[in-house]
Amino acid sequence: MFAKSFPLNPFLESVADRIRERVKGLTGVESLELAPDLKNIYGKTDGEDFFIFNELHQSRGFRKLHIETAVFEPSLEILHVVFFPDPAFDLPIFGVDLIAVPQGISAAIVDLSPVRDKLPRTIENQLAQIEIPSFEKVRKLPDWGDIFSSHVQFITPIGAEENGFFLDLVDKFLTILIDYSESIEPDLDDSPFTIERIEGQMYYCLQQKQNDKTRNVLAKAFSPNWANQYIEMVLFDMPVHTKNLDN
């Protein structure tokens, strides 16, 4: 169901594999269509090869399950994961980003980001019960980081032990989300709660699009127009009133 792409940094691969495994617990997972030139991408920047591979699915409760792996040979590897809920379901956005350089993992973030004023109470309570390791290097959130929850973990993991701690957090966050998604029913498409969650996802996407680092890397490898298209259509597409995938 979730195919691997090209060889990755082993830690990025282990996180991606854990996410793929947990997604098997969702109901009604099916592929999402994506134009071939946006799914498997090859380019060059400064004479070095650049690969992007996208895995896109949907399921009951989620309009898009996106796993992106990218390699800028030989010095940069990226894992980008965002699970956007079907707005009819009262669910947060699951997000993971990992950046690997030759020296190790330079950045790692995981969160369940609210699309209303706060997280669902059950999810909030379960996240609060997680024992967060004392990571040596905690990073500062960007200026547009108000989209993240109070439980976000943004770090530079030091060594194999902290890598393992972070992987465990990814697993716990995602397990909480998936278990909760299977326990709730959707609201109507025209419910004010659904509309509010659509607006919350739109704000999340708008804030993420302020990340100029992503745009600059893509523009350098391809072109500014292509970078904008990729960000708008693949990474942070806006939600619409979706059909509930309720089996």
UniProtKB/Swiss-Prot annotation:
The keyword Phosphoprotein does not apply. The keyword Oxidoreductase applies. It holds the Pfam family Fe_bilin_red. GO terms for biological process: phytochromobilin biosynthetic process. Keywords: Oxidoreductase. Its EC number is 1.3.7.5. InterPro entries: Ferredoxin-dep_bilin_Rdtase (IPR009249), Ferredoxin_bilin_OxRdtase (IPR022870). It catalyses: (2R,3Z)-phycocyanobilin + 4 oxidized [2Fe-2S]-[ferredoxin] = biliverdin IXalpha + 4 reduced [2Fe-2S]-[ferredoxin] + 4 H(+). One of its GO terms (molecular function) is cobalt ion binding. Belongs to the HY2 family. Catalyzes the four-electron reduction of biliverdin IX-alpha (2-electron reduction at both the A and D rings); the reaction proceeds via an isolatable 2-electron intermediate, 181,182-dihydrobiliverdin. PANTHER family: PHYTOCHROMOBILIN:FERREDOXIN OXIDOREDUCTASE, CHLOROPLASTIC (PTHR34557:SF1). This is Phycocyanobilin:ferredoxin oxidoreductase. It comes from Prochlorococcus marinus (strain SARG / CCMP1375 / SS120). The gene is pcyA.
